[in-house]
C-alpha cells in the first residue's frame, strides 16, 4: 500500500440515496470533528451513471493524483456508490472503501427502470431510464487490479445484494479480503456501521493535522 497520506475524501451514495444517508452523515460528522483539515466531498449524484461520473471527475479535477507528492485522495462508496467507487479507484489509483458494494449493477438495476423516490425525501422523485443500464455496464470493472487498495465491508445479512458475489470480487486470489470485514449478520444498510467507522478511517491513512 502507498504511504502517502490522504488529504481529500470523496463519499458516493447508493441508488435512491442522498448525502443525508446515515452512513454519509456519520462520515461527514466525524471528518468535520476530527479531520477538519481534510477536504471532504459528498455530492448528490444524478440518476444517469454517465453524468454522475462526469460530474465526479469534474469535482475532483484539481484533487491529488498519483503524481502529486505528499498528498492523495480516497473514495468511500455504498451499494451503487461502491460500484462507482471501484470504477473511480481503478481510474485514479486511489484507495477505496466499499460498503456492501454493487458488483453487477447493470444486471441488478435493469429491473428498476421507472420512477423512484428518494429514501430520505419521498417527495423528491427521479426517473431511472433504460439507457442508464448500458451506462452502468460501461463502468463495470471485471476484476480489480490491486485488492490491497480496497477495504470492503460486506454483510452476509444483506437483503438486497449477494454477499458471495461481493466477496469474490474484492477478495485476493486466495478468497480472502486483504482489508475489511465479512460480517456474519447486519443488513444492506449496515446499521452497525458506527462500530466499524474508526477502522474505515484508519484504512484511509488520513493526513494528521499540523497541530497534532
Predicted feature locations:
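Glycine-rich phosphate-binding loop signature in dinucleotide/nucleotide-binding domains
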Residues: 3-4, 63-71, 145-146, 206-211
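The alpha/beta-hydrolase serine catalytic core
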Residues: 94-212
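Short hydrophobic segments within beta-strands
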Residues: 10-15, 76, 153-155
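Active-site catalytic motif of lipid deacylating hydrolases and related acyltransferases
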Residues: 5-69, 187
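A structural signal for short coil/turn segments at secondary-structure junctions
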Residues: 35, 67-68, 92, 173-175
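Structural motif
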Residues: 8, 72-74, 95
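Active-site signature of alpha/beta-hydrolase-fold catalytic machinery across serine-
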Residues: 87, 91
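Gly/Ala-rich beta-loop-alpha elbow adjacent to hydrolase catalytic centers
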Residues: 76-81, 85
Amino acid at each position: 500500500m502507498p504511504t502517502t497520506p490522504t488529504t481529500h475524501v470523496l463519499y458516493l451514495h447508493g441508488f435512491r440515496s442522498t448525502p443525508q444517508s446515515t452512513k454519509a452523515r456519520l462520515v461527514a460528522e466525524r471528518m468535520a470533528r476530527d479531520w477538519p483539515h481534510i477536504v471532504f466531498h459528498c455530492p448528490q449524484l444524478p440518476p444517469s451513471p454517465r453524468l454522475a461520473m462526469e460530474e465526479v471527475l469534474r469535482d475532483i479535477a484539481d484533487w491529488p493524483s498519483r503524481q502529486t507528492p505528499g498528498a492523495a485522495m480516497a473514495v468511500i462508496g455504498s451499494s451503487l456508490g461502491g460500484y462507482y467507487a471501484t470504477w473511480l479507484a481503478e481510474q485514479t489509483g486511489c484507495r477505496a472503501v466499499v460498503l456492501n458494494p454493487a458488483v453487477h449493477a447493470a444486471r441488478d438495476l435493469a429491473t428498476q427502470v421507472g420512477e423512484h423516490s428518494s429514501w430520505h425525501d419521498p417527495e423528491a422523485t427521479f426517473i431511472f431510464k433504460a439507457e442508464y443500464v448500458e451506462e452502468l455496464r460501461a463502468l463495470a470493472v471485471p476484476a480489480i487490479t490491486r485488492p490491497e487498495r480496497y477495504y470492503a465491508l460486506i454483510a452476509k445479512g444483506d437483503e438486497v445484494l449477494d454477499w458471495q458475489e461481493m466477496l469474490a470480487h474484492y477478495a485476493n486470489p486466495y478468497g480472502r479480503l486483504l482489508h475489511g470485514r465479512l460480517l456474519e449478520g447486519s443488513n444492506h444498510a449496515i446499521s452497525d456501521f458506527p462500530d466499524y467507522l474508526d477502522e474505515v478511517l484508519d484504512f484511509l491513512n488520513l493526513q494528521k493535522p499540523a497541530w497534532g
